[in-house]
Amino acid sequence: MGLFSFPKEEKLRKQEDFLRVLREGRPYSLSKSFIIYIRKGAEKRRIGISVNKKVGKAVVRNRIKRLIREVYRLHRPYLREDIEMLVIVKPGENIKDLDFHKVKDMLIKIWEKAGALKEQ
């Protein structure tokens, strides 16, 4: 696998995995509409993404998920190996207007705040 790939093993898929991260993880947020739960001490790095239906139609929700996945994929080498995270996007101000750079800035700030980035 390449350095910037996004393998299937790194995706949270099962409901029990999502619930475990919600239950055991700690929430981090920069706004009411963008919350990340990070669970440290996991066996391997994994991510799950949930976008509320009230955010918009499927096109909008899927675009937001693609943006989050792309930021994760590009920053994957810089994230710690022992974290599981769940990104939850709720309706809010300017959520539909998100672009790659806004998502990147938000995620990096939250990852720094949570200590999810590897020490350089």
UniProtKB/Swiss-Prot annotation:
Entry keyword annotation includes Nuclease: yes
Residues in coiled coil: none
Gene Ontology terms: biological process: tRNA 5'-leader removal
GO molecular function (one): 3'-tRNA processing endoribonuclease activity
CC terms in the record's Gene Ontology section: ribonuclease P complex
Annotated catalysed reactions: Endonucleolytic cleavage of RNA, removing 5'-extranucleotides from tRNA precursor
Gene3D superfamilies associated with the record: 3.30.230.10
Record keyword Nucleotide-binding present: no
InterPro entries in UniProt: Ribosomal_Su5_D2-typ_SF, Ribsml_uS5_D2-typ_fold_subgr, RNase_P, RNase_P_CS
UniProt EC number: 3.1.26.5
Entry keywords, A to Z: Endonuclease, Hydrolase, Nuclease, RNA-binding, tRNA processing
Enzyme class: hydrolase
General function of this protein: RNaseP catalyzes the removal of the 5'-leader sequence from pre-tRNA to produce the mature 5'-terminus. It can also cleave other RNA substrates such as 4.5S RNA. The protein component plays an auxiliary but essential role in vivo by binding to the 5'-leader sequence and broadening the substrate specificity of the ribozyme.
Family to which the UniProt record says this protein belongs: Belongs to the RnpA family.
UniProt xrefs under PANTHER family: RIBONUCLEASE P PROTEIN COMPONENT
Subunit organization: Consists of a catalytic RNA component (M1 or rnpB) and a protein subunit.
Protein name stated in the entry: Ribonuclease P protein component
Taxonomic source organism: Dictyoglomus thermophilum (strain ATCC 35947 / DSM 3960 / H-6-12)
Encoding gene, per UniProt annotation: rnpA
